[in-house]
Amino acid sequence: VLNYLINDKKVCGNIDLVYIDPPYNTGGAFETRDFKLAYDDKYTTDGYLRFMRVRLKLLHTLLSEKGSIYVHLDSNMVFHVKILMDDIFGEKNFRGMITRKKCKSKNFTRKTYGNISDYILFYSKSDSAKWNRPYDQWDDEKVLKEYPFIEEGTGRRHKRVPCHAPGTRNGATGGPWRGMMPPEGKHWQYTPEKLDEMDAKGEIYWSSNGNPRRKVYLDQSKGVPVQDIWLDYLDVNNQNSCLTGYPTEKNLDMLKRIIETSSNPGDLVLDCFAGSGTTLVAAEELGRQWIGVDIGEEAIKIIQDRFVNGTKPIGDYVSRRKKKNDFASQSLFDLDFDDEKDTSNSQKTASKVQYQMFEEI
């Protein structure tokens, strides 16, 4: 399917964001909550890396110059795949690795720490990648700690920060202001004229010993800049929420954060391990165009049903069972991993609701 998209001039080089949640090398077989096989996650490390390399190279080609890719993995393969992505996307285009809390604390672990996290590798195709900085809202505890002062007369909550910054400068910011020089090895953050203007507006606080500090107001803050540890996006089956029944369904709000951060309304989003369709739903709700791909017949059925009927209340048990290799369904890793293989002539069959189904031949 990715080869098919590469041959589509309207798509190739025009995808603005890729999010994928590929198999994790767990050695297990994953079932839907009605015990149908979702996918078989069994492979050798070498086979898995060849599988991923082929797809990552195709995804790199499909991305626009302003595009980004997020790859969701666990500790089994995240560092192996990072080496692949450094090679394909370039080390300079590595933007970060997000650590996500995936489930509640465990008290039944083996002789190790409880495994409650997984990881998201974040790369861009170039330095011009789209980036809408995300912010969390202030909570009362953080507000009281970070903005402890109330301005007389206005009641505006604020904090007080130095008027200087590290490093020496030539010119006005390195010279005196009101008879004071900046501390050794530092410079004024603003010119003397700008500091006078701020002082006239009441934006400078003078301490009892005559030390000036700049007021930073809470009502001018966009929020708390998001860091690379995410604690609020547990998997759906670890929350009191609705789900599709797909065993590795991800958190809708997490996908919305990623999509809002690295794309704009009208942009094209791709998920080629679409699974439960969460990426597609998030993209639809945020006004993005989207393409979803999955090799699993059950995944396609779940996605179609989700768009028609939504999700269902949690309650049924979703299992992951390790089984012998006796499945009638084909494993993801039974495919040919040859880099040079061209699957652009895949046989297409029509689907029921604005979908195209592709069959490997």
Where are these regions (language model features)?
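Class I S-adenosyl-L-methionine
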Residues: 1-268, 300
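Conserved S-adenosyl-L-methionine
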Residues: 45, 78, 251-326
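Low-complexity, compositionally biased segments
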Residues: 77-79, 89, 121, 256, ...
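Cysteine-dependent PTP/DSP-like catalytic domain, specifically the C-terminal lobe
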Residues: 107, 294-361
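Short non-domain terminal segments
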Residues: 120, 147, 188, 215, ...
